Amino acid sequence: MAPVGPRKPADGYAVNQKRIRRLMRLMRLMPIYQKPDTSRPAKGHKTYPYLLGGLRIDRPNQVWCADITYLPMRKGFLYLVAIMDWFTRKVLAWRISNTLEADFCVEALNEAIHKFGPPEIMNTDQGSQFTSFAWTDRLKRVGTRISMDGKGRCLDNIFIERLWRSLKYECVYLHAWETGSQAKAGIGRWITFYNHHRPHTAHGGQPPAVVYFNTIETDQQVQAVA
């Protein structure tokens, strides 16, 4: 009888990346990436107080929030900014960039304002993109009040942090995108699903877009009667 010894690497099992990702998901494991700092304040930029403490938020467009996260690619990173309606959790606009310049954030903001009108309050962290003149001036010109999280307090913007967690576990970590166009297409599909089909416990299982537009329509009907 041949001696029994430890298994050699050659005796292992060949599996592809898709199976590895599926098994990692089942075991609730996530890949480890070096996370870029997307919330670093810029020297000399003005910061603003946090305005949401104790505030009752009960309607669309009362408060929006925005944040940036990183998208791990097969090689390197891209960056994603999203603008969300706080009350309904609907993603109003988003952009992907390969740099952390403020331009892609302002583009998303302009799209959201163009489609939905300005919010009463915009809440962000103190990252340099959100303290930049281009961002703050755009908000001031439409009469939006600016609110910023306390430094290092991610819970001040908790709903968009939850969005990032869902996006990464349900979409980003399941892929290894090669190009920005692949990432953009994948993110776009997921956000469309999230807005229009994904049940949300905060509103009785209704998707964010359904809650947003139904509430807007109801408010307009009430105003018309009044």
Task: Please identify what each model-predicted range represents.
Residues 1-226:
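Charged DNA-binding/catalytic regions of mobile-element recombinases
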